A protein has these predicted regions:
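Flexible beta->alpha loop and helix N-cap segments adjacent to enzyme active/binding sites
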Residues: 2-181
Length: 181
């Protein structure tokens, strides 16, 4: 965040995973640039495809504790979230890196102050202090975050300050210490 706020920075790219496992991606980018290929990752959906595994999953034990629905529309998911439900979304290829980018995600209403505790209780061994990262549609980002340089964060690897008027609408997706997303 501090680097993005420097006056001399007008654009910034941060790999979707800032750990040792992303060294291989850095090597690929280095060779890509050196060889002038100009091919870049469009997404980080690099893992296995759940749609190829769906018939191999033992659903019975899962269905004892959870309601499992296949082929649910976005409007149904939105309605479930609006009614206070927590959704585990699994679709397509698994994401590489530190963030769930939509294919393996927990979806919930970020304006509910108690939702973080409910999710942490549902996910055993999750530390209570770990923040959740928000997914915000690009067209609505200016309503929630301060980003005067219009920096892109497609892999959710940049932090932004929240706007004071919208903080409580996205409370559960902000860092508890500094209210960033």
């Amino acid at each position: 965040k501090a680097i993005s706020e420097l006056d001399c920075v007008s654009s910034l790219f941060v790999c979707g995973s800032g750990s040792d496992e992303s060294t291989s991606i850095g090597g690929c980018y280095y060779l890509n640039r050196k060889n002038k290929n100009n091919k870049y990752l469009k997404n980080l959906f690099l893992g296995y495809d759940i749609n190829n595994e769906i018939d191999k999953i033992a659903w019975e034990p899962i269905c004892r504790d959870y309601i499992v629905r296949h082929g649910v529309t976005y409007s149904v998911v939105a309605s479930l979230i609006a009614n206070g439900n927590i959704i585990a979304k699994i679709d397509g290829r698994a994401e590489f890196g530190a963030r769930a980018l939509g294919n393996r995600s927990i979806l919930a209403d970020p304006s509910k102050r108690d939702i973080v505790m409910k999710i942490n209780e549902a996910i055993k061994n999750r530390d209570f202090w770990m923040p959740f990262a928000l997914s915000i549609l690009e067209d609505y980002a200016d309503k929630y975050i301060y980003n005067p340089k219009k920096l892109k964060a497609p892999f959710m690897s940049l932090a932004f300050n929240t706007l004071p008027d919208s903080y409580y609408n996205i409370y559960a997706g902000t860092h508890p210490y500094d209210k960033t997303v």
